[in-house]
Each structure stands twice: as C-alpha cells, then as structure tokens.
Amino acid sequence: MGVPKRRVSKARKNKRRSQWKIAAPKLVSCPHCHQLMIPHRVCKNCGYYDGRQVVNME
C-alpha cells in the first residue's frame, strides 16, 4: 500500500479541497401548477410528470 513520502502542507491540502463545493439544486417551473420543481422528477405539488398525472394527489 502506498504511503506519503512527504507531509502535505495545509495550503496544498486546502487548495485541493477548494473544489469541494456544494451546489444548489436546479429548479424549474412546473408546466401544470407553476410551482418550483426539480427537473426530470414528478412535481411534489400536483403529481404530474411529462404532461400526465403519475401520482394521485389527494
């Protein structure tokens, strides 16, 4: 198993970890009820996906 030959400095470690950003979810408007929803998912508000109701919402 490989072992580090030299200690990784704080600066080098932090530069590498600077790319570990969290991204906010992309949101689009539901074409049926106009609420915000995640694309390519069933709308939580009305249960529609791709122009048809796939989840029965009471």
Curated annotation (Swiss-Prot):
Leader sequence residues: none
Keyword Membrane attached: no
One Gene Ontology cellular component: large ribosomal subunit
Gene Ontology MF: a single term: structural constituent of ribosome
Ribonucleoprotein recorded as keyword: yes
InterPro entries from the UniProt entry: Ribosomal_bL32, Ribosomal_bL32_bact, Ribosomal_zn-bd
UniProt keyword list: Ribonucleoprotein, Ribosomal protein
Coiled coil region boundaries: none
GO biological process, one term: translation
PANTHER family, per the entry: 50S RIBOSOMAL PROTEIN L32, LARGE RIBOSOMAL SUBUNIT PROTEIN BL32
Similarity-based family: Belongs to the bacterial ribosomal protein bL32 family.
Protein name: Large ribosomal subunit protein bL32
Record gene name: rpmF
